[in-house]
Amino acid sequence: MKKGRLKSIIFGGLFSLFIPLGAYLFLKSKGHDGHITLPKQYGIASIDSNIVDGKLQLDTTYHTVADLLVYSQLGDTLALHETYKGKILVYNFFFTSCQTICPPLTKNMKLLNKAFLKNDTSIRFISLSVDPLHDSVPVLRRYANQYEANHDKWIFATASKKSIYDFARYQLLLDLPQGNGDEQDFIHPEQFVLVDKYRNIRGYYNGLDSNDVRRCAEDIAYLLVEKNKIHEKKKR
């Protein structure tokens, strides 16, 4: 994968991100051959070993994020991974009454959203409320409108508390205190989580850190290159 193609995606799609963040994305050297290294996968599910031509080969299988049934700010019931099959997803967590970290988290998610408007068929941004008791459909819609969300591309959603909390802990593999989603349980993660079209986790980012938000943007661009290259091969 050549840098020239990657730069056209980054600088075409992310220019609007650089000004709000106070800097532009610096594409570091990825090797003397001009190729890039794609974001690694997280969550090893299993490792199989085989002997091929007398040599030991390891085949690593990575965790696949299971689907989640939610209701959105538009009142739609969505199975997220089925609805957005083949798309890159960026997840974060919030609740509408939060006055501490949620506003800056949501503003940074908005910046990412705006940065990739030209790639809106390939990416969806998913903000999951950790307070389903309070965050009803009308409340989610008002909150989405407050941040001028494109409702087709940026989904504000929730589900049962146990479903959301289990998804954060056991599917997105966030490092959170143990709990069972009951009334006393509460999580407030500040990470953005990048999931590729195969539902493998490809990155964790501090959504309050501008450098990490840039890194998330860079990794999204890498996955777009990966997606486009696969598509081009199929067309040949």
What are these regions (language model features)?
Residues 78-109, 125-128:
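Short active-site neighborhood of thiol/selenol oxidoreductases, capturing the structured segment around
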Residues 63-65, 87-88, 187-189:
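Short, small/polar residue-rich loop motifs at catalytic or cofactor-binding pockets
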Residues 106-167:
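Structural microenvironment flanking redox-active thiols in thiol-disulfide oxidoreductases
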